[in-house]
């Protein structure tokens, strides 16, 4: 048995930080194994200035990495779960979901804001996410959404270089990179914007038939996180979700039970349909909520009208 394991990762600061966190957890359990990172450049990395919806949605950050897994050049890969397509290649599996951190978004600004109402009329907000855009505009239709891409440092700089009143970021990325936000104000958006499916959770992908790696990954799987994100992904699968229209989905534990919130919206914020606090301890809830939202969609949200 070889004592070396090759781990696939994107090259960005956040991707590397997440991969190193996973490796550190495994090294504590398997001190005799040498973990080596292999960086893989994805379509999403190459096309930094084009919206994700235009270059293929979620899969643009994982396809090349999955190709390496299928070719056997890496043993497993660490992804942000929200980047992973709802249906995997037949020979691959998500082998572990480490404990989830915050799934929520936040608004980072130079202004001291206590709520979204404190933003000036017509404020310029940077985000490249249709999910964030649709929900934000449903609350403040006067806001001007400015598409921005790039790593977290790049996006923070754009607050000044593009005269933005704020940008929306995932709390998880800020936490994992330990970003210094002392010169900014941060508004928690938990009560305003439903998270993306899988946000705040890492996913470790491997070959379905690689029993050695799968047993290894079992050791760092968090059962509650795994259950919750599987409910969310079932919801997304039923909706055919990528990045082409706003979808929010969040399963969470509260008072001893699992609850699920699901949402679809139009990109302009005119229509928002959601179900919240749906008990999700039994299987099939993700599909059920998706079907309920589809039945209520009289506005052509899913068709992209």
Swiss-Prot record:
GO terms for molecular function: hydroxymethylbilane synthase activity. It catalyses: 4 porphobilinogen + H2O = hydroxymethylbilane + 4 NH4(+). InterPro entries: HemC, Porphobilin_deaminase_N, Porphobilinogen_deaminase_C, Porphobilinogen_deaminase_C_sf. Belongs to the HMBS family. Its EC number is 2.5.1.61. Keywords: Porphyrin biosynthesis, Transferase. Its cofactor is dipyrromethane. Tetrapolymerization of the monopyrrole PBG into the hydroxymethylbilane pre-uroporphyrinogen in several discrete steps. GO terms for cellular component: cytoplasm. It comes from the Bacteria. It is an enzyme of class 2 (transferase). Binds 1 dipyrromethane group covalently. The modification S-(dipyrrolylmethanemethyl)cysteine is found at residue 243. The porphobilinogen subunits are added to the dipyrromethane group. GO terms for biological process: protoporphyrinogen IX biosynthetic process. SUPFAM superfamilies: Periplasmic binding protein-like II, Porphobilinogen deaminase (hydroxymethylbilane synthase), C-terminal domain. Pathway: Porphyrin-containing compound metabolism; protoporphyrin-IX biosynthesis; coproporphyrinogen-III from 5-aminolevulinate: step 2/4. This is Porphobilinogen deaminase. Monomer.
């Amino acid at each position: 048995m070889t004592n070396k394991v090759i781990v696939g990762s994107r090259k960005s600061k956040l991707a590397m930080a997440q991969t190193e966190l996973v490796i550190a957890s495994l090294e504590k359990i398997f001190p005799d194994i040498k973990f080596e990172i292999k960086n893989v450049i994805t379509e999403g990395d190459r096309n930094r200035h084009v919206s994700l919806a235009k270059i293929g949605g979620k899969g643009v950050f994982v396809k090349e990495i999955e190709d390496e897994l299928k070719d056997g050049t890496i043993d497993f890969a660490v992804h942000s779960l929200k980047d992973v397509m709802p249906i995997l290649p037949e020979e691959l599996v998500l082998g572990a979901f480490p404990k989830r951190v915050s799934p929520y978004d936040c608004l980072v600004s130079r202004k001291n804001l206590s709520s979204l109402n404190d933003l000036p009329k017509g404020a310029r907000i940077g985000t490249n996410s249709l999910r964030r855009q649709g929900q934000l505009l449903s609350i403040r239709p006067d806001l001007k959404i400015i598409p921005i891409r790039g790593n977290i440092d790049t996006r923070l700089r754009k607050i000044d270089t593009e005269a933005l009143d704020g940008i929306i970021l995932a709390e998880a990325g800020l936490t994992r990179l330990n970003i210094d936000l002392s010169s900014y104000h941060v508004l928690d958006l938990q009560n305003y914007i439903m998270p993306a499916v899988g946000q705040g959770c890492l996913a470790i992908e491997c070959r379905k038939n690689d029993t050695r790696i799968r047993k290894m990954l079992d050791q760092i799987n968090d059962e509650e996180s795994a259950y919750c994100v599987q409910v969310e992904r079932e919801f997304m699968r039923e909706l055919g979700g990528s990045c082409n229209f706003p979808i929010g989905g969040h399963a969470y534990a509260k008072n001893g039970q699992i609850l699920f919130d699901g949402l679809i919206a139009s990109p302009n914020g005119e229509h928002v349909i959601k179900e919240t606090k749906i008990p999700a301890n039994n299987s099939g809830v993700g599909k059920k909520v998706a079907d309920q939202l589809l039945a209520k969609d009289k506005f052509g949200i899913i068709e992209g009208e």
